[in-house]
A protein has these predicted regions:
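Domain-level marker for long, solvent-exposed, non-transmembrane regions
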Residues: 1-181
Length: 181
C-alpha cells in the first residue's frame, strides 16, 4: 500500500504565524480520527479547528492586554478602566472569532483521519479599531501598534507557509451552524 504524502499545512501546529506573504495570521488545526464516532467527521474537525483557534486567540488577547498595560505605565489605569479594557477586548474577540474561516480540509486516505485548518487574519482586529469612534486617533494608533507588536512577540519570527491541500472533502462555508453563545 502506497502512503499518500500529507499537505504541508497538516504539520503546522495551532498558533500565531506570519504567512509566506508576510500577513499576520492565527491558525487553529483540528482533526478527527476514523475510529471516532461522529456522523459528520468533517464538521467535527472544523469545530475542533475553531476551538484551537479560539485557544490561540485567547492567549494572544491576554498578551495584548499585558502589553497595553505595561506600555502605558505613564498613564496608570484605574481598576474600573482596567476592567473596562479587558471587557471591551473580550467582547471584540468573540465578534472577531466569528469571522474565522476554514481554509483547508484533507482526508488522509491511509488512515481515514480528517484535518481542518481555521484561519483568522490579524487585520480583522486592527480593522475593528476603525469602528470605535469613542477612541481618539492617538489611542487608536497606539492600540494598532500594540496589536501588531503583541502578535510579533508571539511568532518569534516564525513563518509558516500554508499550501492549499488537494481537496478530498468539499470545502464549503457552514451557514447552518448554530452558535452556542
Amino acid at each position: 500500500m502506497n502512503e499518500v504524502a500529507a499537505p504541508e499545512w497538516t504539520a503546522l501546529k495551532s498558533g500565531v504565524y506570519q504567512d509566506a506573504s508576510g500577513k499576520a495570521v492565527f491558525y487553529g488545526q483540528g482533526s478527527v480520527g476514523k475510529d471516532e464516532i461522529s456522523q459528520d467527521r468533517k464538521t467535527l474537525s472544523e469545530d475542533r479547528a475553531r476551538d484551537e483557534l479560539a485557544k490561540v486567540f485567547t492567549s494572544y488577547m491576554e498578551r495584548l492586554v499585558e502589553k497595553i498595560l505595561t506600555s502605558r505605565s505613564d498613564i496608570p489605569l484605574t481598576d474600573v478602566n482596567n476592567v473596562q479594557l479587558r471587557n471591551s477586548i473580550e467582547e471584540g474577540a468573540v465578534t472577531i472569532l466569528m469571522e474565522a474561516t476554514i481554509t483547508n480540509h484533507w482526508l488522509n486516505p491511509d488512515n481515514g483521519k480528517v484535518y481542518s485548518m481555521a484561519e483568522l487574519d490579524l487585520r480583522r482586529l486592527t480593522d475593528k479599531l476603525e469602528s470605535f469612534n469613542s477612541i481618539s486617533m492617538e489611542d487608536r494608533s497606539f492600540l494598532e501598534g500594540t496589536i501588531v507588536a503583541a502578535h510579533a512577540s508571539m511568532t518569534n519570527g516564525t513563518v509558516g507557509q500554508v499550501a492549499m491541500a488537494e481537496e478530498r472533502i468539499d470545502v464549503q462555508p457552514k451557514f447552518d451552524r448554530l452558535l452556542s453563545y
